[in-house]
Each structure stands twice: as C-alpha cells, then as structure tokens.
Design a protein with these regions (language model features):
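Non-catalytic, surface beta->alpha helical segment in thiol-disulfide oxidoreductase systems
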Residues: 120, 125-156
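N-terminal targeting signals for export/organelle localization
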Residues: 1-46, 156
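Hydrophobic beta-strand anchors of alpha/beta hydrolase catalytic cores
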Residues: 70-71, 101, 124
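A short beta-strand-turn-helix
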Residues: 42-68
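Conserved acidic residues
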Residues: 105-107
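Typically the conserved alpha-helix immediately C-terminal to a functionally engaged Cys/Sec
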Residues: 80-95
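Short pre-active-site segment immediately N-terminal to redox-active cysteine/selenocysteine motifs
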Residues: 66-69, 73-77, 120
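C-type cytochrome heme c attachment motif
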Residues: 76-83, 114, 123
C-alpha cells in the first residue's frame, strides 16, 4: 500500500474510533419487542426520540412504544447511579420483556435531559403505554422499582 493509501486508511480508522468513543455509535436498540432478553439497554438521545418519545417536537406527550418503559438517566460519576444499575438489571430479568428498561448517560444526552427536566441523578422516567409518565429522583430499592413497574403495567 502506498503512503497516500496508508494515510487515508489511518484517517478513516481514526475518525471511526473518534465517532465510537463519542457515544454516537452505541449498539442499536432496534425494536422494543427484541429487547425481552437484553436486560437494561443503553441508548442515546436519537434512539430515545425513535423508540420512546420525539422530544424534539413541540406538543403533548406521545409515547412511541407498545410496552411500558423505564428510562434510567444517570451520570458515570454518580455513586447512587452505580448502585441502582444492578437493581435495574434484576428488575429486567424479573419482568422478562413485560417492561423495557433503557439507560441514558444524561451528560451525553444534555438536550434530552434538559427537555425532560432531569435535575438530579439518578432520575427514572416511568412510562405506561397509555397515560402520563412520571419522574422519580434518587436511588430506589428493588421493592420500589417492582411497585413502579407494576403501576406502569396497569397493576396496583
């Protein structure tokens, strides 16, 4: 390979790595129905707009999913967020796809976080298929998470 080709290849690989590290190339959370065995699924703000709610459009809340959703807005430096994650993984295993659980690095998704009203970490967004979503700030116990999951599924 000549010097020009090697330089071009290096630039392409470097840009690809930069794109990946920036968080824009998170593995796709394609369809909610395919998330049943996945546990907590990391998404970015573009995926949130596609799968959950298009926050870029003005107007009333319009949920895009067909199953209840919990969205964990976290910060990588947040101790309570780190303690919450295993509880959410446990809840995802217990729910077996009845409730989809997404996780978003709120600092990388600053515009979304601002529009949703994230002011503290962790913040959970509980979204029923029909009705109004609710926000909960702070660390929740597994028992509280189960109760919230039951609520958004239409239970007690």
């Amino acid at each position: 390979m000549d010097k020009w080709g090697l330089t071009l290849l290096s630039m392409v690989v470097g840009l690809g790595l930069l794109y990946f590290v920036s968080g824009d190339m998170i593995p796709s959370a394609s369809a909610q129905s395919g998330q049943e065995e996945a546990g907590v699924v990391e998404i970015n703000q573009a995926q949130f707009a596609e799968l959950v709610y298009d926050y870029t459009q003005e107007g009333e809340w319009q949920f895009k999913g067909d199953k209840p959703v919990i969205v964990d807005f976290y910060a990588v430096w947040c101790g309570p967020c780190k303690r919450l994650h295993p509880r959410l993984e446990q809840l995802a295993r217990e729910q077996k796809g009845e409730v989809i659980i997404y996780s978003i690095d709120a600092e990388k998704a600053a515009e979304l976080s601002r529009r949703i009203g994230i002011r503290a970490f962790p913040t959970l967004l509980f979204i029923p298929v029909e009705g109004t979503p609710t926000l909960s700030e702070g660390l929740l116990s597994l028992k509280d998470l189960r109760q919230q999951a039951d609520k958004i599924k239409g239970g007690h």
